[in-house]
């Protein structure tokens, strides 16, 4: 039997603690049957309470995180705090409507993703110029334009591998370890970067060492895995430019990309167009093509591919 400690003092116990939900949430019974029920039944009661059709909070939190993922900022900018200490929603009616859509679609996330990415708000350009809107809403809280967003660390890694043609898109199965493990007085993890297919899987399958963050990923603002991170911090530093330009992984993938475009092209001009198509999903402008021709003639395809993988256009979504 667990009892409530008065003022946190274990020597001064009060009433018996019983499984229950928050009393302020009145969409369903706050009691879960007391301690007489088996643990499995109490867990089921909690799960049913969380996803009860009359409980909008769970759905609001979920759709807000989906919105945050696509726009870089949620309708509520404090994704882990919907209480009195959190931010107010910028579009409360939209938040509630999306929450109801989630329920209507049987809690499936894919329809909500589709709904968001096909919306007029999402399909706006971040380059839109509107002096009046900028003066009234410089932070773009009301979404009069799209937010320019930089790819997160995992997406940068996956995009580089996809562009070079080395990304392993196999779904499921065991993850990969990009570190060596040594048993000592305390475990020692040393990150390695051999150029082999086992390490070319998507980043979602990468084993995370909570006590030893990956340096390259950390430089690109991958959060410390030992801490809870409701929203990632975005920074722009010289270290990021140096890492993207000189990291061993980036140099190897630039080499693979150069080999790929060379094999898939019959001429230098065609190789340049193919490199731009793979990296930027477009053809080069006349000025870009002339500059690329000069660079390739002097330093080879590797230098062009290295430059493309380091360009803002590769790492940012407009």
Regions found by a protein language model. Give the residues of each.
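Primarily short, surface-exposed interaction patches in extracytoplasmic proteins
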Residues: 1-198, 223-232, 245, 250-302, ...
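Glycine-rich phosphate-binding loop at the start of an alpha helix
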Residues: 235
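Conserved beta-structured recognition patch
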Residues: 207
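Charge-dense polyanion-binding interfaces
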Residues: 300-314
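Active-site Gly/Thr loop motif
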Residues: 202, 212-221
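Exposed, low-complexity/repetitive linear segments and helix-based recognition motifs
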Residues: 218-221, 285, 310
